[in-house]
């Protein structure tokens, strides 16, 4: 396949055109006075959204070189969205400003590699400044504020704050579509695994078709149990202390299952057999989680333990176990608190180091199950387009609220970035051209406030000057501009706040991608194939 190439200034200009197209579409959504964007779909109603990353992902340009620039800017929004779920429009606005200012410097003869080095030093100073002024999120009202700002809806803010308070900061909160038009909440106490009873003969509550065991002992193994001889020793020992026994194994079938069912029907033992959740290595990890939560021992041949060696001390304990045909819930496991906390910290460390989104999601699920909090938020609306748009806002607000709890909050409305500009005065540069990188970020940090004002129909430069003057006069760094009311005042008092993690990620991702773009010297793309037009079929001699 033959290629076409662009070099030097031509290459960078082509990238800039792509960046500008995406940024101009995305930045109209910034802030509470931002506009919606309507996206055409091949089938059904168009998607109407206020979400920057959704808009960015839909843009595909005809020119391959411009499309490269567009894709790079989409990467800024996507990366920010993946990490924190919000701040995508801010990141896009910052990246566009850095690219535009940087290309001017490069065209004037500055060294792009040194500009990038200056940008990297500058972003470190900004991140350190943001972290130093962070205000910890302490109560439900703070979480409600943060979520309400992200979703542009106070009802969603209150709902998320209530659910987060209930399940804790490590809890899993999933967002689903509801059949009705209102919001619904569902909570699951204890650890829930997505496997039900192996046989309906284990059911103790026929009305609800559930097996309920009070204060049971729990045998946990990764082995398949087919022969009753495998578990007979531990069954005999367990029967001396309890009748209630739960077996969680890879599978229970054949003679072993038949014996358990017969003895259950006779009333000799109140047993429940459940298949182990997950697959492969994840299954072993989840079984180990259950063992730690219940204070039991995972019986596995990998660690030199056979089933016939199990004792009562190896069995886990819980206040209650409830199982239906699809799920099993372990309520109030009797495991050692220190061991559970250590396991939680271990999973947290794995979440920080993993590079796979799928693995991260599964680890967070495990974390929540150990911490004992799972909730489902069901979003309802009158029409499907409204439902999809509302669900998207709830997901964004949820991510934002989590970020706020994690790293704290700063004044919103672009104030935190504006206040971080003086930190750039302390950046030590080695070469003259590195100063240009610092200057570029200095100008870019004003851009979010400028764009917020622009979307509200105000002059951005006038708003920034007024904010700076009022901050100096009143000696209050929290003063900013409320674009909804048109008032100047303390952003914290007005409840206009941003999570530090969102603001930090937006700056870091914008600088990262913009730096790559500025240091690009050549572009390579396929030459588009010209497809011949399809010939018009003949009439076939028929006379109409």
Swiss-Prot record:
InterPro entries for this protein: Cpn60/GroEL, Cpn60/GroEL/TCP-1, GroEL-like_apical_dom_sf, GROEL-like_equatorial_sf, TCP-1-like_intermed_sf
Catalytic activity: ATP + H2O + a folded polypeptide = ADP + phosphate + an unfolded polypeptide
Residues given in the record as ATP binding sites: 29-32, 86-90, 413, 482-484, 498
This protein's record includes keyword Ribosomal protein: no
GO CC annotations, alphabetized: cytoplasm
Protein name: Chaperonin GroEL 2
Free-text function comment from the UniProt entry: Together with its co-chaperonin GroES, plays an essential role in assisting protein folding. The GroEL-GroES system forms a nano-cage that allows encapsulation of the non-native substrate proteins and provides a physical environment optimized to promote and accelerate protein folding.
Source species taxonomy: Bacteria, Bacillati, Chloroflexota, Chloroflexia, Chloroflexales
EC number: 5.6.1.7
């Amino acid at each position: 396949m033959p290629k076409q190439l662009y070099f030097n200034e031509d290459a960078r200009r082509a990238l800039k055109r792509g960046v500008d197209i995406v940024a101009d579409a995305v930045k109209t959504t910034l802030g509470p006075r931002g506009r919606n964007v309507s996206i055409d779909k091949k089938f059904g109603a168009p998607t109407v959204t206020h979400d920057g990353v959704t808009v960015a992902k839909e843009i595909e340009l005809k020119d391959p070189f411009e499309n490269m620039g567009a894709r790079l800017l989409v990467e800024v929004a996507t990366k920010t969205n993946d990490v924190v779920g919000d701040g995508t429009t801010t990141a896009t606005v910052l990246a566009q400003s850095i690219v535009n200012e940087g290309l001017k410097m490069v065209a004037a003869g500055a060294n792009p590699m040194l500009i990038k080095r200056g940008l990297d030093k500058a972003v470190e100073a900004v991140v350190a400044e943001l972290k130093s002024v962070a205000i910890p999120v302490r109560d439900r009202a703070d979480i409600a504020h943060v979520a309400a700002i992200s979703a542009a809806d106070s009802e969603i803010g209150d709902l998320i704050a209530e659910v987060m308070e209930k399940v804790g900061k490590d809890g899993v909160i999933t967002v689903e579509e509801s059949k009705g038009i209102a919001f619904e909440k569902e909570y699951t106490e204890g650890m829930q695994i997505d496997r039900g009873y192996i046989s309906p003969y284990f059911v103790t509550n026929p009305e609800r078709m559930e097996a309920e065991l009070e204060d049971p002992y729990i045998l946990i193994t990764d082995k398949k149990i087919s022969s009753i001889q495998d578990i007979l020793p531990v069954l005999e020992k367990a029967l001396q202390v309890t009748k209630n026994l739960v077996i969680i194994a890879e599978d229970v079938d054949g003679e072993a299952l038949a014996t358990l069912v017969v003895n259950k029907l006779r009333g000799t033992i109140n047993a429940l057999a459940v298949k182990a959740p997950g697959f492969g290595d994840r299954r072993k990890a989840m079984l180990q989680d259950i063992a730690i939560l219940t204070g039991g021992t995972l019986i596995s041949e990998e660690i030199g333990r056979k089933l016939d060696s199990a004792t009562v001390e190896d069995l886990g304990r819980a206040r209650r176990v409830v199982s239906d045909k699809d799920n099993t819930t372990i309520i109030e496991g009797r495991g050692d608190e220190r061991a559970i906390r250590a396991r939680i910290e271990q999973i947290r460390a794995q979440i920080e180091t993993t590079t796979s989104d799928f693995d991260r999601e599964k680890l967070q699920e495990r974390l929540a199950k150990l911490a004992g909090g799972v909730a489902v938020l069901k979003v309802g609306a009158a029409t499907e387009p409204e439902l999809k748009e509302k669900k998207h806002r709830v997901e964004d607000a949820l991510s934002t609220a989590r970020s706020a709890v994690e790293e704290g909050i700063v004044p919103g409305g672009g104030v935190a970035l504006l206040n971080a500009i003086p930190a750039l005065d302390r950046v030590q540069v080695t070469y003259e051209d590195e100063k240009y990188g610092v200057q570029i970020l200095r100008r870019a940090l004003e851009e979010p406030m400028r764009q917020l004002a622009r979307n509200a129909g105000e002059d951005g430069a006038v708003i920034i000057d007024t904010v700076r003057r009022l901050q100096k006069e009143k000696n209050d760094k929290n003063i900013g501009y409320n674009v909804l009311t048109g008032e100047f005042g303390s952003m914290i008092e007005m409840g206009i706040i941003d999570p530090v993690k969102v603001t930090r990620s937006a700056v870091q991702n914008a600088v990262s991608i913009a730096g790559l773009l500025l240091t690009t010297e050549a572009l390579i793309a396929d030459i588009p194939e010209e497809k011949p037009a399809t010939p018009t079929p003949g009439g076939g001699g028929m006379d109409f």
